[in-house]
A protein has these predicted regions:
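Short, charged low-complexity linear segments at domain edges
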Residues: 1, 87-111
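Residues immediately within or flanking Cys/His clusters that coordinate Zn2+
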Residues: 9-12, 122
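Short cysteine-rich clusters marking metal-coordination/redox-active sites
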Residues: 15-18, 125-128
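Short, non-ligating residues that shape and space the ligands of small metal-coordination modules
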Residues: 24-25, 131-135
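Short cysteine/histidine-rich metal-coordination sites, predominantly Zn2+-binding motifs
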Residues: 30-41, 138-151
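Long intrinsically disordered, low-complexity regions that are acidic and Ser/Thr-rich
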Residues: 41-93
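Eukaryote-biased detector of low-complexity, proline/serine/threonine-rich segments
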Residues: 117-126
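Charge-dense, extended regions
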Residues: 149-177
Length: 177
């Protein structure tokens, strides 16, 4: 994922282990962020009329596409002009973006999640240092960064990061505006 600008989201939640309130942070991307997508197991019949084994531009969605006829894979580098996104399960992040995030929280660092069975950058409780898993915060409706009411959304404070790009290997989903 790449974006020419980003926002650090800040909120608070109860730690699952010690039950004390702890600050948590996330990364929001504004419209026009770019992301890479890989589609495996594509049937050659679905490629009819496509340019094979060469990158080419597309207009809808806007970006670049490569149909690999030898591996039956589609590689896409797309731009999202319509919606904001929030990152989760961040496996890698550019060092300059991470240093800005760490100015807000020293408790955002890589840890292994037994639930997700992977290592990713995660929030940790400021009291007991327990990892605060991304799923409940970012992917579960009603989670701190997945508000379902305007009252929940008002609890999120956005810090705009100016003049800094972000590169990340992460999941993303459309953020509710």
């Amino acid at each position: 994922i790449f974006s020419q600008r980003f926002y650090i989201a800040e909120s608070y939640q109860s730690c699952w282990r010690c039950k004390k309130i702890t600050p948590v942070f996330g990364v929001f991307l504004p419209r026009w962020f770019s992301y890479r997508d890989v589609v495996c197991g594509v049937k050659p019949a679905e490629w009819e009329g496509r340019i094979l084994d060469k990158w080419y531009e597309t207009s809808s969605p806007r970006g670049m596409v490569y149909f690999d006829s030898k591996k039956n894979i589609i590689y896409q580098w797309l731009t999202n002009p319509k919606a904001w996104a929030i990152l989760s399960n961040v496996r890698r992040i550019s060092s300059s973006a991470l240093s800005i995030i760490n100015k807000h929280s020293k408790l955002y660092y890589p840890a292994y999640s037994k639930t997700a069975k992977m290592t990713y950058y995660a929030n940790h409780c400021c009291h007991c240092k327990s990892m605060q898993g991304d799923f409940m915060m970012f992917d579960e409706p009603g989670g701190v960064f997945y508000p379902v009411t305007s009252e929940q959304a008002k609890k999120i404070k956005l810090h705009e990061v100016i003049n800094e790009t972000i590169f990340a290997n992460a999941n993303h989903r459309q953020a509710i505006e």
